[in-house]
Amino acid sequence: LRAIQEQVAGLPWVATARVSRQWPDTLDVTVTEEEPAARWGADGLLNAQGRLFIRHTTHIPAELPRLAGPEGSEAEVAARYVAIHEKLVERGLGIAALELDGRGAWTMLLSNGIGVRLGSQDVDIRLARFFEALDSVVAPVAVDVQVVDMRYTNGFSVGWKQQRSARSTTDEDLPALTRSREA
């Protein structure tokens, strides 16, 4: 029975399997299917625990966020995704993609198309600064923002879309907080 249970549990879409004998000549097999929570790389699937359960598939639900990172980093990237996602949902946003590169640098793409560069050092501090900037500075001009670079020690930079809206951003668009820093 154990060998059968291990074989069934080893199938790609099987999260858990239980095999028991029903006397006299019946096997009872109970299977729980994996539920994909995110894409991994180009064609893999992660479950909610951050476990890569399919390495290559042709059918990937389009609504799943795309996570990526070095081999073996699936759980770390998934945990970071969950932590960031919770804070973004409060603001009506989500994560379209989150990546950890081979040097340990984090980048993400928000559901509204804004890219965010977090780098590899002090990521939690940079994320806190990003959420503060998102609420107070970026949100009012989000339609014109292409990327926010948080890799600076005491600030951040904004990369604007090439095709800016008809009106340009003025000092009046920015909150008093940023103007007071210039004084």
Protein language model regions, located:
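Charged, solvent-exposed interaction patches on well-folded alpha/beta domains
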Residues: A3-G10, T16-A183
